[in-house]
């Protein structure tokens, strides 16, 4: 009662067994987990148009609001943001196996990079400071791993131990977050360790590109923030 938007889980399921595909699959599963937890805690709401239901009246309200005017993509996210800010307790993100949808990961690194740049660029238009703070925190954490690695290579000794301990801690936290959700979603967490290393590099890279390279390619057209 009073629900105007229902967010369903969307998972990436790729063909083959590539490291890039495994990393995208785990990354997207992680985003779904964080988004589900955040919605239950009322921190922020996030979802994908690939598995989203909403009432007709709230959709027309959203169109009239021009909430995402002049933003190239992300109407699904901005619709959720608009509804959650206007109507209290109106967005639901249930943990339900019966409303899971599936999508394909990007086939190559260039396509993947452009997709993530597009997502990162639209985040600058979010009006909810909680979600901005969350993504900024994740980026800073991953940057700290790169800095720690550089210090370990240059100085050795204690820095190597600190880096190894921090990295081991990250792997443990990520594994115990993804493993139960992988079982719930009936998705394996293949190549977890390699994908987790890859994930650190990609998060840092995308963050820098979002700040300093504001252009991206989408549907064979080039856009700029």
Where are the predicted features?
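Catalytic donor/gating beta->alpha subdomain of glycosyltransferases that bind UDP-sugars
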Residues: 3-32, 60, 66-131
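Short hydrophobic helices that act as membrane-entry/anchoring signals
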Residues: 21-36, 118, 122-125, 192-195, ...
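Short, P/G- and charge-enriched loop/turn segments at secondary-structure junctions
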Residues: 37-43
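Short secondary-structure boundary/capping segments
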Residues: 43-44, 91-92, 208, 215
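Conserved nucleotide-sugar donor-binding
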Residues: 46-63
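Short linear elements at protein peripheries
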Residues: 48-50, 218-225
